[in-house]
Amino acid sequence: MMRKTLLLLAATVACAFSAQARKTYTLSSPEGRLQTTVAADDALTYAVTFDGRPVLDASPLSLTLDDGTTWGVDPRVAGVSRTSVDAVIPSPFYRADSLRERYNSLTLRMKDDWSVEFRAYDDGIAYRFVSRAKKPFNVVSEQAEYRFPADFEATVPYVARGNEGDFESQFFNSFENTYTTARLSALDPGRLMFLPLAVDAGDGVKVCITETDLENYPGLYLTNAGAAKNGLKGVFAPCPEKLEQGGHNNLQMLVRERKDHIAEINAPRTFPWRVAIVGTDTDLAASDLSFLLAAPSKIDDTSWIKPGKVAWEWWNDWNISDVDFRAGINTETYKYYIDFAAEKGIEYVILDEGWAVNKQADLMQVVPEIDLPEIVNYGQQKGVGIILWAGYWAFDRDLENVCKHYSEMGVKGFKVDFMDRDDQQMTAFNYRAAATAARYGLILDLHGTHKPAGLNRTWPNVLNFEGVHGLEQMKWLSLIHISEPT
């Protein structure tokens, strides 16, 4: 009898622990229209409803490490914390001087060295992993899936044609293309989609998927997860193993071999936010979540940062008429552009590709037709700042000296081009470049890079991103592309 009693007690305790392991946690937005339900069962999942209607079914999230453990499989919750925030944050050089940030958060602290944090804003749900591990480790893979209640229609940007082939060849791209609209089941499983992308959940409600706070971690691509799942699954570029200088005018570093993991983690850290913005088309356009979820500014005094328009000589191929000199990449032409900018109230003139010796990836070698100090001084007299174009590798290989040298000359900033990757090494470069430029009072315009993902909040000297299928493309594409969404 005693044995039966002990067995019954043990079974009761086991059931209690099992029920606890299967416990779900709900988190609602401040206004209550959005709700996420997080389940810590055999797998860690979350689902999202909007006004009580499912817009995202239970979707798994996990990180697999090089020691064989997987954060998110059989998670063991050690503690739960909740907070609510309603604050006003500064947002210089954004679309408003300040923003209201209001959200409710849920953090599940696991018995291992990690946590997962969820936030519910009125316009979206976001989550991120947090590592407390003090020893270095590698992330072999990340599971980021989005499973929808039905075969919804999606509007997505595939990696552009010309990068066809396996995913490895598609990891090298400029993140600019027109958008394709198709049912989730009809999306090409052999092609990567970059972010952001939108899924139409019906009744005027859209779900926009993106990420932010993307520092020192590979960017998220999505691909078709299979018709049975009505969803999308994440793909990440592995860390580069072997790089070779090449590409456009020898200004890029091309990945020839990759490692067997996507990220190398050396200290406790937070991981990028996975964001689902939910609402109408207007709500999506008005959302500030990418900015709000990023790390706060690391520049205390931003008074030196001056946004402005730029006169862009590359667009019309340096062609000007009715002048008494030969137009082109030379001092006289740039003085003409400076005069034009001063007359029209344009704050900057850019010296696009061609001012430095080509194919050398050396920004200290200026072509003989250019007297750069004279151009900079002339611009200062006219109240016009000078921005220099720089290929990524030429900029990165001598970053400190380049920034120091041209800052002392009076140059105001750089347009950095041809990154064309978003593996961990490249996203780390973006932050390193911004930090170095800030030390020398330089602004940055990043071209040929991934979507905006929080960098401009953390380093507000980054004034622009040019990763859209924009004006540049009109020089060589047929007019039919103008009617396609970009």
Positions of predicted regions on the chain:
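Glycine-enriched loop-and-adjacent helix/strand subsegments that border the catalytic/binding cleft
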Residues: N249-A263, P268-G345
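Acidic/polar loop patches that form or flank catalytic/metal-binding clefts of enzymes
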Residues: I443-G448, L471-L477
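Bacterial Sec-dependent N-terminal signal peptides
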Residues: M1-K23
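Substrate-binding cleft of carbohydrate-active enzyme catalytic domains
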Residues: P307-K451
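N-terminal accessory beta-strand-rich subdomains and adjacent acidic, glycine-rich linkers
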Residues: R22-L292
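Residue-level detector of conserved catalytic or cofactor/ligand-binding positions
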Residues: L477-T486
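Substrate-binding cleft/loops of secretory-pathway carbohydrate-active enzymes
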Residues: H405, P452-M474
